[in-house]
UniProtKB/Swiss-Prot annotation:
Major subcellular location class: nucleus
Annotated protein name in UniProt: Inner kinetochore subunit fta7
Keywords per UniProt: Cell cycle, Cell division, Centromere, Chromosome, Chromosome partition, Cytoplasm, Cytoskeleton, Kinetochore, Microtubule, Mitosis, Nucleus
Location in the cell: Nucleus; Chromosome, Centromere, Kinetochore; Cytoplasm, Cytoskeleton, Microtubule organizing center, Spindle pole body
Subunit and interaction comment: Component of the heterotetrameric kinetochore subcomplex COMA, which consists of fta2, fta7, mal2 and mis17. The COMA subcomplex is part of a larger constitutive centromere-associated network (CCAN) (also known as central kinetochore Sim4 complex in fission yeast), which is composed of at least cnl2, cnp3, cnp20, fta1, fta2, fta3, fta4, fta6, fta7, mal2, mhf1, mhf2, mis6, mis15, mis17, sim4 and wip1.
GO cellular component: condensed chromosome, centromeric region; cytoplasm; inner kinetochore; kinetochore; microtubule; Mis6-Sim4 complex; nucleus; spindle pole body
Listed transmembrane segments: none
Family: Belongs to the CENP-Q/OKP1 family.
Role: Component of the kinetochore, a multiprotein complex that assembles on centromeric DNA and attaches chromosomes to spindle microtubules, mediating chromosome segregation and sister chromatid segregation during meiosis and mitosis. Component of the inner kinetochore COMA complex, which connects centromere-associated proteins and the outer kinetochore. COMA interacts with other inner kinetochore proteins to form the inner kinetochore constitutive centromere-associated network (CCAN), which serves as a structural platform for outer kinetochore assembly.
GO biological process: cell division; mitotic sister chromatid segregation
Amino acid sequence: MEMKRRVRAVRRDQIQKRWRPLEDKQRQEIIIIFRTCSRLVLNTIKSETRKSLAEEWFMNILLKIEAPLRNLPVPRKRKESILFSQLLSSNMQLEQQLYSDLDHINVLQQELKVETARLENEQKSYEEMKQNMAINNSRLADLKSKLHPYLKKGLKISHDNFSDSNDFSFQKKLNTEDSNTSKTSTLDMYKEKLKPFTKTMQIHANKTVQLSQTIQKATLLLQRLNNTKNIGLNKSSKLKIKNI
């Protein structure tokens, strides 16, 4: 929610007579609000060096702000403002919950990276197995095409040795069945080897989907927490502006 700017003309003699500087407690509350709001920005900095430099720069700015606040005249209160201690405690609770959610998101992101790396390795292994299977199939087909003439030649010789033509047809059928059986057994062997990789890839894919859904839920929760904190701060700012 965007705050609207309000301008009010006040005479100088009225400021000198009725307005008074801020109390020490009020100045401390203003500094605490600045520090609380600054944490949300500083925590987004990933580099520890840049974060420490930003904190040092912000503390210097606060020191420069605190000196003029001591002599800044403000009007007297007309109504009771909201209790700052309650607002501060609720903000601290939301901030702690936000930190725990951020830690949980970091853990989920690390697990997601690990599962993604495992899934990539499984996919590579699966592709290698498929390539090996294709190479072996091509070798089997090549051997089959090369062996058939020799087998036929051998069968012709055996036909000359044996008078019965049924023996020759039986031998040809037997050789063909042996070739088909060896090819089928090889295919079954590689299919059995590929089954564990396929199951593992499916498990990792399901885990990846679950982690992605959990991260989305945590992100929505963080957005709600930030919106709640911003609404609390906006309400306190509006009440202070009304008092002014």
